[in-house]
Amino acid sequence: MEEESSSWFIPKVLVLSVILSLVIVKGMSLLWWRPRKIEEHFSKQGIRGPPYHFFIGNVKELVGMMLKASSHPMPFSHNILPRVLSFYHHWRKIYGATFLVWFGPTFRLTVADPDLIREIFSKSEFYEKNEAHPLVKQLEGDGLLSLKGEKWAHHRKIISPTFHMENLKLLVPVVLKSVTDMVDKWSDKLSENGEVEVDVYEWFQILTEDVISRTAFGSSYEDGRAVFRLQAQQMLLCAEAFQKVFIPGYRFFPTRGNLKSWKLDKEIRKSLLKLIERRRQNAIDGEGEECKEPAAKDLLGLMIQAKNVTVQDIVEECKSFFFAGKQTTSNLLTWTTILLSMHPEWQAKARDEVLRVCGSRDVPTKDHVVKLKTLSMILNESLRLYPPIVATIRRAKSDVKLGGYKIPCGTELLIPIIAVHHDQAIWGNDVNEFNPARFADGVPRAAKHPVGFIPFGLGVRTCIGQNLAILQAKLTLAVMIQRFTFHLAPTYQHAPTVLMLLYPQHGAPITFRRLTNHED
């Protein structure tokens, strides 16, 4: 009996030993030998970078630099690259603009040369959008922001009519209602001396949430807004979890925050499913605003009417629309208001234009928007200095040649948008100064290279909602400038910080003063 059991035991041990050996070999290949081969491959082409460390890559140094840079506010300067992308700023000085950096065993090649960037964005057959981290995907949804291939093209074709200029013009009254409601509330808070301090970062979040809700859900606005409130709560929890993204498996831990986030995710999906079913039923019954003309096309209505779109697809697109639409526009408005507070001479120029085009009492119209050239210049300069997305990533789908470099399949290409926007060779000696006049002859002539300005990306995947963001920003600023003068509050601390998007770490308190008849 003992001989029989031992005869079974020995093969089991051998099998386990073989499996363990294979796991060790595979692990060593992934965590040590492969990184060494990659470093050697790029070194032969003159590309270096901080040395790879077993398992963690350069994460320890990278996180340390980012935490140190954001640990205290910075002076009132627009040279924010050393703060918001500190690892890139530091290693660029050592290794040049194109270098290798390791996020664990995953390698990324930084690419800041505008010619190479144009090549990456224009050749979608060779380069694809990188797979988002699961926490990011939980926030932005598995919609247009993360889809690839035919499904991405199908969804973009369905959603595009929402963002056509003719449709956006129909949204002007919608945006203006939200904006005037906001500034009316500010007016109600004015003190006896005609001033009020407002954290515009918080207020613009509420404003853009309101506009995005109306744009996404149309006649189902109130139900949609309730869903977006749940998503706003989930966004805060995911942002907290994202700060611990380098702890392996943290998103699976049953922490209080994760448990609450999972619960919210179920509530969001359940609420959206109910909303979609109700909207579908209304369409069948011939009820709702969608039957009236003219009416703006909303995202939900277009997706419900489309073929080959599942309910789950609609849920994911609603999440994507909320995340991208709300954050991008609110951040653009926040930084532009901060810039106009720092530079009163440009605030005065913008006011002169708004009062000349719109008058001091009339609400701006769709016809006024195209005439606000100074505001366009100001918004472009704001997007240059403080782009909502400071970097983006593409992935090589196969072995490919980029410029003169041989790029292996799977290479992640990190494009530091903010470094391109702050490149002296592209923008001149005043690169870190707020100078909207550089855009006086339009975007194409503002920089020394056509790819010098890419706040909304480039190529086929350029941001689909950029026209809505600019329209909303123009209308909001026009109404604000008509009614108030404004400057930085004494409590304002200049601390641009990145948590997926560029935002003011300590908020944006601004003091608004009612514009008197004399100033009109």
Swiss-Prot record:
Instruction: Spell out the subcellular localization from the entry.
Output: Membrane
* UniProt entry tagged with the keyword Ribosomal protein: no
Query: What Enzyme Commission number(s) appear in the record?
Result: 1.14.-.-
GO MF annotations, alphabetized: heme binding; iron ion binding; oxidoreductase activity, acting on paired donors, with incorporation or reduction of molecular oxygen; steroid hydroxylase activity
Binding-site residues, heme:
463
- Phenotypic effect of disruption: No visible phenotype under normal growth condition, but reduced responsiveness of hypocotyls to light and increased responsiveness to brassinolide (BL).
Carries keyword Metal-binding?
yes
Q: Any other comment in the entry?
A: Plants overexpressing CYP734A1 exhibit severe dwarfism.
Q: State the name under which the record lists this protein.
A: Cytochrome P450 734A1
Q: Which gene encodes it?
A: CYP734A1
